[in-house]
């Protein structure tokens, strides 16, 4: 039997409580997780360690979520981004989705909805690797 490596998710959020809660939740669902306290910290690591999916806050000091999306393209355009924000607006939603986000969720995030969104976003990557969430 071949054991497949779990997909790697990057959690990028400046709020430590949210970052830790998301990390614990997706880890318990079987994903590998790297957490980043800022968009700049994530961008410094992405070239060396590309995740299978990014859970991205929009409103962070310094390098915000929109900046991260823009900086990821084109080198990492194939990495799905799911925006998780506490500041919902139709303008932000449209901007994130037009920037390539595969999902847009508002805090507080429902766990089942988050997992469904992640599964849909990484379906192509995990099908190739043969991984399924436990």
Question: What feature does the model see in each segment?
Answer:
Residues 49-55:
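Active-site beta3 strand of CheY-like receiver
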Residues 67, 88-103:
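Alpha4 helix (beta4-alpha4-beta5 surface) of REC/receiver domains from two-component response regulators
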Residues 60:
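Receiver (REC) domain active-site loop signature in two-component systems and cognate sites
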Residues 16-34:
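Two-component/phosphorelay signaling modules centered on CheY-like receiver
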Residues 37-38, 64-68:
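Acidic catalytic/metal-coordinating carboxylates
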Residues 91, 109-119:
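C-terminal output helix
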């Amino acid at each position: 039997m071949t054991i497949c490596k779990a997909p790697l998710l990057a959690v990028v959020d400046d709020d430590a409580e949210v970052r830790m809660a998301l990390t614990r939740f997706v880890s318990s669902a079987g994903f590998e997780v790297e957490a980043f306290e800022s968009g700049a910290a994530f961008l410094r690591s992405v070239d060396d360690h590309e995740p299978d999916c990014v859970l991205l806050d929009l409103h962070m000091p310094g390098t915000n979520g929109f900046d991260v999306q823009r900086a990821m393209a084109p080198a990492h355009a194939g990495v799905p981004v799911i925006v998780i924000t506490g500041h919902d607006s139709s303008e932000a939603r449209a901007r994130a989705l037009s920037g390539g986000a595969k999902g847009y969720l508002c805090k507080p995030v429902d766990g089942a909805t988050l997992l469904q969104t992640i599964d849909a976003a990484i379906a192509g990557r995990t099908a190739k690797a043969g991984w399924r969430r436990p």
